[in-house]
Amino acid sequence: MATLHAYFDPANYSLFFVLGVLTHVFIFRRGEWDLHVFNILQAFAVLESSLVYIVTRAVQAQGLSLWKVTTISSCFTLSTLMGLLISILMYRSWFHRLRRFPGPFCARLSNLYITFRAFKKNRLYEEVQQLHRRYGDIVRIGPNELSIIDPHALRALHSNSSPCTKGPWYSVEHPIKALQMTRDKEEHAYRRKAWDLAFSSKALREYEARVAGYTTQLVDQIEASQSTPIDASLWFNFYSFDVMGDLAFGRTFDMLKNGTAHPFMELVHSNMLTAGSLSHLPWIFPLLKRIPLLNQKTLEFQGWLKQQVDWRQKNNPDLPDVFSWILSDYDALDKPTAQDTINLRGDAQLIAVAGSDTTAASLSCLFSELAVNPETCLNLQRELDQYHAEHDKPDHLSLSKLRYLQACIDESMRLYPAIPSGLQRMTPPEGLDIGNTYLPGDTIVTIPTYTFNRDERLFTHADKFIPERWTTKKELTKDPSNFVPFSIGQYSCVGKQLGLMETRFVASQILVKYNVRLAHEDVARDFVAGLRDGFTLAMPSLSLVFTQRTT
């Protein structure tokens, strides 16, 4: 029978400490464990319970209390955890394959560092920009993550020929796997076929009348409140969510008509801000989904989404919408699995969210810049006046040929990218060369779009709104191919043309009828200061005044 003294022998604690080190070296040092965090916690709980049982049986003749037994076993468990933690920290600090890349020392140790910076003001894109100014083109912002603004990186990471895959962040919604979150290249290519049909030129022509109808509703609201300040970003959100609600679920949210936010929009904005702030801690999402109270909004949202999809499956719209193509692909399956059904709901969510948040952001930032730059706005209005003089009714094909309108849209998207912190990728196991720099395999890499788009090496006067850089002053853009607001390659934005259609319709219909100005001189400053990084760019209030044009 073991004595009590034996259990406090330092050799026993050393044994468990070494066990923790070996657990890191041979298990956790390899692969992705983010989705298994709950199982890992369960494993340590089982370890603790087993140790309590073993120690109890071993010293039962000595009549120790449960408290003392638990204390002994907990010390063993803590020794294991200490070994694990110290091994992780030492490895990340001095032995990790990314040790030669510059960056804050704390970023080497844990993703908590970059998460803290993200939470400070919800403006991670500015935090990363500051890091690049200090450390250069390639910055280690996490234990296994690099942020890169080297121009060579764009095609190396995102082109069709890139060997990179999507990073761990794309698993945060597990088990939901919308098209955007699909990491397997073959599966993504297969599922994307239905989406390509949904956004083909033929399909877009069928959506055009509905987009025009919602644009008219938006203009009517501006007409009703002209010459008085309105929150333009709020109304642009109403517009984009109404459009995508129609195209995703076969029925609108009626926010333009009612002038009030639908709970769906509020849930989306709340969830996106949380997701953006915690994007570098993918392991925390499985925990949040399982913890009562903390998962309440998620459960409400998923319940509401299920109701919408169930209703849409039973009610075919008179006119085809985006979801018609996705649903047709689902119905073609011989025996849809439970995962197929979950993915269908994820795709419905993707249609409604991806096309609404980004379009609202594009419109808000565009009109903010036009209000600040009246000469630019006047030049655009001249182009639109000529267009409307030659066309009885606007259509997307002809609107897409307006050079200055597109230049203003492009310049706005350059300064205020819809996904300011960029898209996560994972290098292939064999690694990847970026220019003259070798990136080790299985490394998380991101091009921070906001910082990249404001790089003076790529764009002269990079922080200024100059639409002419895309038309008459092309020398201000060193290489136009570095501007990819909808990304490139097989993962590029499938809804690009629909988003542009909405933006072009709204800008052309409003500016041909109204002048736009800031409600007061601090609006532009407050707007830029209020932008937030919620994976997509989240909009603050934008108080604008629209007045009827007299000429």
UniProtKB/Swiss-Prot annotation:
Pfam families: p450 (PF00067). The chain crosses the membrane at residues 8-28, 35-55, 69-89. Induction: Expressed during infection of barley and Brachypodium. It is an enzyme of class 1 (oxidoreductase). It is a multi-pass membrane protein. It comes from the Eukaryota. Keywords: Glycoprotein, Heme, Iron, Membrane, Metal-binding, Monooxygenase, Oxidoreductase, Transmembrane, Transmembrane helix. Heme binds at C493. One of its GO terms (molecular function) is oxidoreductase activity, acting on paired donors, with incorporation or reduction of molecular oxygen. CDD domains: CYP67-like (cd11061). Its cofactor is heme. It is found in: Membrane. Glycans are attached at N258. The keyword Aminoacyl-tRNA synthetase does not apply. GO terms for cellular component: membrane. Its EC number is 1.-.-.-. Disruption phenotype: Results in the production of only two cytokinins, isopentenylaldehyde and 8-oxo-isopentenyladenine. Pathway: Secondary metabolite biosynthesis. Its main location: membrane. Belongs to the cytochrome P450 family. Cytochrome P450 monooxygenase; part of the gene cluster that mediates the biosynthesis of cytokinins such as fusatin, fusatinic acids or 8-oxofusatin, known for their growth promoting and anti-senescence activities toward host plants. FCK1 is a bifunctional enzyme that performs the first steps in the biosynthesis of Fusarium cytokinins. It first condenses adenosine monophosphate (AMP) with dimethylallyl diphosphate (DMAPP) to yield isoprenyl adenosine monophosphate. It then catalyzes the removal of the phosphoribose to produce isopentenylaldehyde. This is Cytochrome P450 monooxygenase FCK2. It comes from Fusarium pseudograminearum (strain CS3096). The gene is FCK2.
